[in-house]
Structures are given as structure tokens and as C-alpha cells.
């Protein structure tokens, strides 16, 4: 199926901390975002709520610039493949999930892209790191800058816990891999940004961890414990993460 949407947003960035990165401070002010988006989804999973077999692929794009003050094209794609282990382990809750995703932000026109429109790495798409905890950063302040090119992949083994089924708990062990890079070349111009220390590399980050999902009365609750095993010194770790919504 294919979905289309249009967004017209008047964005105002203000009250920025005086200690924030120069790259963030220059973003202060109002911009008008006029964006057309589309997503094509091919879903062959056995269930959208709690899949145990099949796969889903999503491909989409966002075009901003129709009458607004922001101009870019952002492409994105992701896929998940579910491999049931019931045949070998005699339990439908043993499922291997392989996932991958990515995106590219291409600025259009003669202006640099804005931080808020870039991709960020960490949190949901790279457990063991804070949202924005990996990827381009201003070392002078420690602020994340986002990036134009993102890719992620993960392998996750889901398994039942030795508890009554009515409790609704499922465990998992995972390996996450991801990379984010790409910032404007103007960021390295010290005459424009004196004192700034931008760093940008495409080296992959890797984390491992365990977690569980609880089908609570108010919805799905996810708890993950992640540990980076390949990272940069300036990355920001997140050992514990609590999330709400559908991880399946």
C-alpha cells in the first residue's frame, strides 16, 4: 500500500542555551516547512501486532520546498524479517528478527540543511546509546549535530521467559549496528564558527544487550539494557531504556 501526506509547519526555535553549540545557536528563528511525504509498504507478516513469521519492507521519501523556507529531499527505507524457531524449539515465542534501515538527506538550493531535519542515531534505532548519542558532534560543547546519511541493522532473538503466559512477558537478546555521518562543509570554516570543533566520521557503532516486552493493560512496555562494544570516546552511552509502543 502507498500513503501520501502533506505538512505545513511554522517552526520557531528560541530560548537556546548560551552554552549550546554555535551550530545550534545559528538555527534560532522561524522557518516554514512545506513538505510532501510518501511511504510504500509491502507487508507479508503473519500479524501486525505480534509477528512471528514473514517480512515487511517500507520505502519512502520527503520533499520539502513547495512554498516553504526549507528545501531538501529525504529518502528512507527499512525492513524486518521474522524467522520462527517453533519447528526446532517447540514454542512459537522463539523468533529471530533481522532488521535494517537507512536514509539520505539531500539539501536542495544554496542553503545548508537544518539540524532538526537530519537523522539521529541512538535510542530506538541503536540501543545502548542515547538518542543522538552517536554520530556527528561539536566537541566544544558535546552537542549532537545529526547527520545526512544513516544506516542501521540489528539481529534480535526473542524468547519466552519461565513465567505464566498470562503475565505477558517476552525476553530478547540483541546486537545493534549503525552509522551516521554527513554535515555541511561550512561547519569546518573557523572564520564562520570560531571555537567550534565539529567531528564527523562514518565508523559503525555496535551495541549488545538484553531486554523484555510486557503486554501491560495500558499497552506494550519495552525495557532494554544495552552496552556499546564499538564506539567513539565522545559518544554518549545509555545503559537502560524504557519505551512505550510497538517494538514487534
Question: Where are the language model's segments positioned?
Answer:
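A generic beta-sheet turn/junction motif
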Residues: 175, 214-218, 248
Amino acid at each position: 500500500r502507498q500513503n501520501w501526506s502533506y505538512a505545513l509547519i511554522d517552526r520557531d526555535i528560541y530560548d537556546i542555551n548560551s552554552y549550546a553549540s554555535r551550530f545550534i545557536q545559528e538555527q534560532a528563528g522561524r522557518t516554514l516547512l512545506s513538505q510532501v511525504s510518501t511511504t510504500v509498504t509491502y507487508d507479508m507478516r503473519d500479524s501486525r501486532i505480534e509477528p512471528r513469521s514473514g517480512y515487511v519492507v517500507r520505502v519512502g521519501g520527503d520533499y520539502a520546498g513547495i512554498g516553504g523556507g526549507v528545501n531538501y529531499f529525504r529518502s528512507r527505507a527499512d525492513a524486518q524479517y521474522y524467522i520462527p524457531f517453533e519447528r526446532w524449539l517447540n514454542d512459537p515465542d522463539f523468533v529471530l528478527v533481522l532488521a535494517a534501515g537507512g536514509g539520505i538527506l539531500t539539501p536542495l538550493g544554496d542553503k545548508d540543511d537544518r539540524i532538526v531535519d537530519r537523522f539521529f542515531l541512538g535510542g530506538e534505532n541503536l540501543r545502548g546509546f542515547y538518542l543522538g548519542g552517536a554520530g556527528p558532534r561539536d566537541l566544544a560543547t558535546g552537542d549532537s549535530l545529526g547527520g545526512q546519511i544513516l544506516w542501521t541493522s540489528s539481529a534480535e532473538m526473542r524468547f519466552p521467559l519461565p513465567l505464566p503466559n498470562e503475565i505477558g512477558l517476552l525476553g530478547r537478546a540483541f546486537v545493534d549496528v549503525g552509522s551516521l555521518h554527513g554535515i555541511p562543509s561550512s561547519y569546518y570554516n573557523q572564520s564562520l564558527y570560531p571555537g567550534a570543533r565539529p567531528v564527523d566520521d562514518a565508523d559503525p557503532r555496535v551495541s549488545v544487550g538484553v531486554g523484555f516486552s510486557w503486554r501491560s493493560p495500558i499497552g506494550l512496555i519495552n525495557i532494554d539494557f544495552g552496552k556499546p562494544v564499538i564506539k567513539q570516546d565522545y559518544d554518549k552511552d545509555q545503559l537502560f531504556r524504557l519505551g512505550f509502543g510497538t517494538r514487534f
